[in-house]
């Protein structure tokens, strides 16, 4: 099986969208991605060249994470990672900061010039 997360080899500097799914791409009771909402995200990605980091609870469920990554890849949206969950309620901002810190440290250790220079979180919370 190929990796769902893509390398960042040709992206300098990086712009990232930390993406929630429920309430953003899935506003229904069926946990189904909505094409019109995916189209909005696709337009934003095309206009900015941003990559995606999944911060949604969908990252915790392998089948939902796979479904999301495949849907995004189908639209030429690159997923470069996912945040690590925290046990603390409402900790999503801290999870994002932890991802950025870890990502930058990893790139530095590998002597790679990749840094996320700009980012935003798209979340309904």
For each of these PLM feature ranges, what is it?
Residues 10-90:
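Alpha-helical substrate-recognition element adjacent to the catalytic core
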Residues 2-13, 43, 100-115:
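Short amphipathic alpha-helices and their capping/turn segments at secondary-structure boundaries
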Residues 66, 72-125:
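C-terminal cap/substrate-recognition subdomain and adjoining C-terminal extension
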